[in-house]
Amino acid sequence: MQRHKELYKEQSLVLSPRNHCQENRDRLQAARAKKREDCFYQNRIISVSPTPVKIKQLAAAQAALTQENVAPKLESPERLDTKPAELLKESNPKVSRQKLYLQRYMEWKIAKTKEHKQQDQKRRGAAINVPTVKQSKALPKSQTFRVPDNLASAKQKEAAPMFQPPKRCSLYMIANPTGKGKAAEPIKPSIPKPTSAAAPPSSNTVAASSALARHKSAASATKIVPAIRQNNNPVALARQKAAARPIPNTTKQTTSVRQPGIEAKKITTTIPRPTPATVTKAKTPGIRQQPPVVSTKPRLPEPPAPRTARLPNVLSKPFEKPLGNKAPVTRRANVVKPQPIRGGGGAAAKFKDTAGATSKAASHSIRMKATKIKSQYTRLQDNVRKLPQLKAELLHAATLDIPPLTPLDDIHNPFIDQATSTQCKSNNSSGHLLEAFGDTILLSPVAPVKAEGESSVKRQLLPEGKKEASGPVAKKKFDFTRYSVANSPAEDSLILDPQQTTVKEDTGDSTLVPEGTKTPPRRESNGMPNYLSPFVSVSRGKVNSRCEKEKRNSFYLSNEESPLEVRRAIESVLYFRLQLENEITRLQALCAEWEAYSKENEARLQETGGIDMINVTIGQTRLLTTKKMMQFSGLIDRCEAGATGKNSQPNDGSEDSKPVQAEDLEGWWDMLRLQSENVDKRFDNLKRWKANDWLDPDAVAEEPKQPKPKPKISRNMKIKSKAKPSSNLQQFLRKAHANMKKTKVEEPTLEDGLPATSSRHSSPRVIVVRNRRSFSPARTVLRMSTGEGRQSIAPNALLKSAILAAAEQNAAKTPPPKPRTSILKTPGTTKRQNRGVLFSAKKSVRRFQFTYEEGNISNDETVGADKLEDCEEDMSLEASTESGSLEQNPGRDSNQENEATPRTYTLRNRRVNLRPSSEFM
């Protein structure tokens, strides 16, 4: 609500709608109190015992009419003698309970009817211009607007009717032997004849039990002053307090200071026997010697003297909350005649005059029951609305001087750090405030105190050299709020004025001087429209953006003339029209500048070709300003016509008649800005050419790049020579090859009847090695057909073939022993069909290395056979699968050493029958 502080007028707390929840709670509280009170009354009379019955309320009211301030001693003895007889007669046990109930009901009904009539008369009220003297008759029950007794005549006092209490009241008496026995001597008051006012009664030492025993004879004393409902209006009570503020007389009691009027009331209403009326009788003439005080207020209802609060459990004995040890103020001597007790208490106790009010000790009270009506404290709004002088008070409040608005952030108080409980402490005397500040109505509660001179203790605590240094003002955030316009004169009088002038004095104090009451002026227009794009956010976050949107909408406070959307559209029109005019003016100035330059330097520009660049840029700029921007100007006019309703065309669905919104103007302007920036880049390029004397600034003379020197290859580098077989090895290979041919010629047919194999060139050439990169222990089989390549395609082909042939020869003569069978192999698995896989020699086999020993083939043939065992077995396996030979029986004994019988090996999970290599090579 801080950002809306200046936008809306403030309402009073009593009339504001904030009291709805409190009002509901007060209703429930009043209902509960009424229920408890009804329960109490129903349970009081439980039998037809000789319980003392109080006198009729009407008779008590008539008696109190003429004897308001008279003690019970002034009554005639005949009347005192007849009262016990009447009470005994009324409480006769022979009377049936039904008759008593009917009698009480009829009395209650009569009192209720009178109360309703008085309430209706009070609610209707009198005219505003009725003279004040007649208000006691027109509004007989009004406690707020009745005439003070010191101004009314005796005839009006006698004619003023008294009221009946709305509820049944207690018959019990209050005896206070402890408090009354300690009445001290009076101190010297400012009023003459003070001793008679404070004379203690003669029966102060009576015990509580004796007072209760004689409560029948004192019943008239308790009923002389009936309770009247207090009208608890905070506004009216505040006016009363400000209008008539008497300085009371003071007498010393045990724990508190009392006013003379309250003393008289206390003595009148709480004495258990009707004898000590001389105190009041002696006090009254002494007070009447003072001249009456005539009020100088205008013709508003004149309030009475301040009345004291009444405790909820006692009907006619008021008490107050102790206010502490405050010294009595005896500056003014205008004493008002004490008023009769008319039911104080309620909300009026909150508005008592604290400067001159006295306090009574709450410890003297004896709480018995609650007879206070709770509704007096509640339903403040309804009670205020029913006041007859409400309009007059509101007009009077509107014409009062309004206190200045004191913003905390604009005032520097040098005593903020030194303040403890309060910032501004003063004496209890209001006269000192008047001397120091003059009119206290316009005193700001937070402004620095302006004292006369340097006598203040706080100011002496300040360092001497310390002065208010005007530091740099911090940069404030962007504020979207704006003042509203008050149209009616009533609002002008009620709106607080935010315009103030700060006056700097030589002493360093800053004083706020309020200006004249007037409506804050609107923001002065400096030619810039009040527009912010709806697509632009100057804050971060969803919550901040939402608050920013609310502030932006608060720009356009709706009034009676135009709604919010219209004002927003008009602001957009003004903004974009101004932006468009500025942009067109700027671009046209650039075109004129370059045209003048091209005419002055036409020869140089034609020589270098720069005149064409200038003409192209100027042409694009004029095309933009005369076409696109003129079209945008037409859209702005259409948006304004749609918002104001002037020169607007009906929407027939065509492009020319569609309504244009502020968001459409925003999008168009963004597109125009892109084209305008493109034109600006062209003008910047012209400036670059102009600075380079119309030579291409990007065409820099590039130096020929020297190629990087390649690394020289030295002819002395060692080239790996291919391994050449030694002469002994060549001879060995030739010999082995010849022996192989001889062996094939001698064996034309195979033992098993298969056709003889073809020559070595037609048979598949198989090389089996281990792949060193593979983790599997299985051997890699390389198979190459004869027709795919020559035998001498590899440098070691001759060597390999010779070694394999020699190994086959040795294996044919002496077969190697059977190797161990792996424990991971299963012997009884069925034979799977083998698939020949052709591997690339370059990928799988990187290098072949055969271990051999020269000369050991012929001498020790077993060594070579053992070293080439892996190669021999795998080669035999591949040869057996490729040749498609007959399958041998796996169950045949594998221990047969005959050459014709094939060997059986276990490979992985199957058995493989191997035939001798001599059949293939």
Swiss-Prot record:
Its main location: membrane. The modification Phosphoserine is found at residues 49, 76, 170, 444, 554, 785, 792. Expressed in the central nervous system and at different stages of gametogenesis. In embryos, it is expressed in central nervous system and brain. In testis, it is strongly expressed in pre-meiotic germ cells, but is not found in somatic or post-meiotic cells. GO terms for cellular component: cytoplasm; mitotic spindle; nucleoplasm; nucleus; plasma membrane; spindle; spindle microtubule; spindle pole. It is found in: Cell membrane; Nucleus, Nucleoplasm; Cytoplasm; Cytoplasm, Cytoskeleton, Spindle. Residues 179-208, 273-325, 500-531, 641-660, 743-763, 809-833, 861-921 are annotated as: Disordered. The modification Phosphotyrosine is found at residue 172. Keywords: Cell cycle, Cell membrane, Cytoplasm, Cytoskeleton, Membrane, Nucleus, Phosphoprotein. It comes from the Eukaryota. GO terms for biological process: centrosome localization; chromosome segregation; kinetochore assembly; mitotic spindle organization; regulation of cell cycle; regulation of mitotic cell cycle; signaling; spindle organization. Residues 193-208, 273-285 have a biased composition (Low complexity). The keyword DNA damage does not apply. It is a peripheral membrane protein. The keyword NADP does not apply. Residues 878-907 have a biased composition (Polar residues). It holds the Pfam family GKAP. The modification Phosphothreonine is found at residues 51, 519, 826. GO terms for molecular function: microtubule binding; protein phosphatase 1 binding. InterPro entries: SAPAP (IPR005026). Belongs to the SAPAP family. Cell cycle regulator. This is Guanylate kinase-associated protein mars. It comes from Drosophila melanogaster (Fruit fly). The gene is mars.
